[in-house]
Swiss-Prot record:
Keywords for the protein's UniProt record, in alphabetical order: Cell wall, S-layer, Secreted, Signal, Virulence
Signal peptide residue numbers: 1-21
The protein's name: S-layer protein
Predominant localisation class: secreted
Gene: vapA
Self-association and partners: Monomer. Forms oligomers at high protein or low salt concentrations.
Length: 502
């Protein structure tokens, strides 16, 4: 008898214990839509943000929802709920109209679809009337980060089924979220059921509802490339009488639903544009003579443009094919420089009311080089007494001479039959000295390193790759056993990399 009593008591206690199941939130896969917003959005604008993704909360156990308890939604990240907009979302608009922002489903063996009918919603939540419309009883607390939806006083009797569901139509919660301008990262929600100082359905986090990041982004597939020919005094290009064209140059509004006024976005092309064809007003033109949108600066060292007219909607990419074009005329008289052109797009905060200042930059929209000869030599540190003699025999270089570029790689200390990793110290930096037409230049490794700001460790092997703007040149390297020991080297398969090794 005693044993039977204990068993019966255990059954009673077990049946009274809360389920403590997790809320099941859907969707929770790659169909989830995160609303991307620009972190530079001004605060008065970002105060009123709308999520695009609707959520379904599934309470999988009978008893997850308790009489006079709450369904609790809490913001994770930098954000708050807006009281007036939440109230509007949780109201039905007029008397007995169905609710649209929040739907319910008791899931009685699959016999019900999600419903906003007043009688169905009332089975889940407490409802009050202001004489015009009905509103689900709710409270916002915890500094605006927590929203509590008040469950009905008899929800345990009316919703006595597993897998009861509440659908949150967040896309109808217009401007219900106040996000923080300047913040980076994501904002999500947790959802759970709370009663009597305990969670009866443990809260679970959603995927990010919001992501704050860039406003727009520049992109391209391939830079526009050309080589100025030394045989033509760098006045003409290896591509002939044709446009230099970048491939797939574009700008993308990376937000989900924010609009950008295109005439507020300014573009800047940085690099010497003196050699490119222009009209009488300084506007750069293509081979056909049509303006491509860039206007050269007075000093010729840059060009500017306005993105265009109209608006660019969220998620839209605009092709910028015209801006990705340059042209050197057949009768050009200005030597084309060796230069990498960078482009910047920016929007000023004082030019419009939605965004603070923002910019995005793209390196190497155009890459212009000059042809010439390449050679390399290996030296042991800056203690080397080597002398490098470079001569031009073309006699056709422009007045400013041919530039000399150097790339320096230093190798880690290693003994014979050992190995040492290479570290690139500088890449294709121009020396301050140029090669005169029909003239010569004499260089010391230590002076070369100092000229380009490189520090080579004494006694370490270093490879110096020279690119000289002459198509007819001679090089001689005087190797000496001074304080450092220099190495004569030959490398198999270097023909595509250098013309010769000394």
């Amino acid at each position: 008898m005693f044993k039977k009593t204990l068993i019966a008591a255990a059954i009673v206690v077990g049946s009274a214990a809360p389920a403590f199941a997790d809320v099941v939130i859907s969707p929770n896969d790659n169909t989830f839509v995160t609303t991307s917003l620009a972190s530079v959005t001004k605060q008065p604008v970002l105060d009123f943000s709308t999520a695009q993704q609707n959520l379904t909360l599934n309470f999988s156990e009978v008893g997850d929802l308790k009489n006079n308890g709450f369904i609790v939604l809490e913001i994770q990240g930098e954000g708050q709920f807006n009281d007036a907009e939440i109230r509007q979302w949780l109201s039905n608009g007029f008397w007995r109209r169905p609710f649209t922002g929040l739907l319910v489903n008791p899931n009685d063996h699959g016999n019900f679809a999600n419903s906003g009918e007043v009688n169905d919603v009332r089975k889940f939540f407490k409802i009050i009337s202001d004489g015009t419309q009905l509103t689900i009883v709710h409270t916002i607390d915890s500094n605006g980060k927590r929203l509590r939806l008040a469950l009905a006083s008899d929800v345990e009797e009316t919703i006595n089924f597993a897998d009861a569901e509440v659908e949150l139509k967040l896309n109808l919660a217009n401007q219900a979220f106040k996000l923080t301008s300047g913040s980076q990262g994501t904002v999500a929600l947790t959802a759970g059921a709370l009663w009597n100082a305990s969670y009866t359905a443990d809260p679970v986090a959603t995927k990010p509802l919001f992501k704050l990041g860039k406003l727009f982004q520049l992109s391209l597939t391939n830079a526009g490339k050309a080589t100025a020919l030394v045989s033509e005094g760098f006045l003409k290009l290896n591509i002939g009488d044709a446009n230099i064209s970048a491939t797939d140059f574009a700008i993308t509004n990376v937000t989900t639903n924010q609009t950008i006024q295109r005439d507020k976005v300014n573009l800047t092309l940085t690099g010497d544009v003196s050699a490119f064809k222009k009209d009488a007003n300084g506007n750069l033109v293509n081979k056909a003579g049509a303006s491509i949108g860039w206007k050269a600066a007075a000093d010729g060292q840059s060009a500017t443009a306005v993105l265009g007219a109209g608006n660019m909607a969220g998620g839209v990419q605009n092709a910028l094919a015209a801006f990705g074009t340059l042209y050197v005329a057949a009768d050009n008289t200005v030597p084309v420089p060796a230069v990498n052109f960078n482009v910047k797009a920016e929007i000023q905060g004082d030019s419009q009311a939605t965004y603070n200042y923002f910019k995005d930059e793209l390196a190497d929209l155009f890459i212009l080089t000059r042809d010439g000869m390449k050679f390399d030599t290996i030296t042991t540190g800056t203690t080397s007494a080597n002398l490098i003699h470079i001569r031009d025999v073309s006699n056709i270089l422009p007045t400013e001479g041919g530039k000399i570029f150097v790339t320096i790689t230093e190798y880690a200390d290693h003994a014979a039959n050992g190995r040492g990793e290479g570290t690139v110290l500088v890449t294709r930096k121009a020396l301050s000295v140029t090669l005169p037409s029909g003239g010569a230049v004499t260089l010391k490794p230590a002076d070369v390193a100092a000229d380009v700001g490189a520090s080579i460790t004494a006694g370490r092997q270093a490879r110096l790759v020279f690119e000289v703007e002459t198509n007819q040149g001679e090089v001689a390297v005087k190797k000496s056993n001074a304080e450092g020991v220099d190495i004569q080297n030959g490398t198999r398969g270097t023909a595509p990399l250098v013309d010769f090794t000394l």
